[in-house]
């Protein structure tokens, strides 16, 4: 497994009023939505045909909430590739507001044969696209 940390995607997140919960800060579930959107945008840059019989599957996701985010807010979400294995990769998601880290997420993605429901090695053409 290759271990390194390379920024692969960065996006601006505009917190919506509906992202708030009863306690007046962004609901914890919304962070996972932000992370998911960043992952999808990054995968789209790889120009993958996601209708194939193989592709990415999220097998683990976690978030550490460091500081509350309160509406209105504009955040920067920086996604990094943490490690790349035979059939899996680990992504880190760092969420910033005014240069302060607000939350840190991690996600494990496995390349899967959808018909066999089994993990497989990253195809060479995909591996070459991943920094």
What does each model-found stretch correspond to?
Residues 1-76, 82-131:
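Terminal targeting signals and extreme-terminal segments of soluble enzymes
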């Amino acid at each position: 497994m290759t271990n390194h940390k390379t920024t692969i995607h960065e996006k601006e997140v505009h917190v919506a009023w509906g992202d708030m919960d009863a306690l007046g800060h962004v609901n914890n579930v919304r962070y996972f939505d932000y992370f998911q959107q960043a992952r999808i945008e990054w995968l789209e840059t790889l120009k993958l045909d996601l209708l194939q019989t193989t592709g990415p599957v999220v097998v683990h996701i976690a978030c550490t909430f460091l500081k509350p985010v309160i509406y209105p807010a504009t955040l920067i979400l920086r996604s990094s590739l943490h490690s790349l294995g035979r059939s899996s990769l680990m992504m880190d998601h760092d969420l910033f507001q005014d240069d302060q880290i607000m939350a840190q997420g991690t996600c494990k993605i496995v390349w899967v044969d959808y018909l066999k429901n089994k993990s497989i090695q990253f195809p060479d053409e995909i591996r070459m696209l991943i920094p």
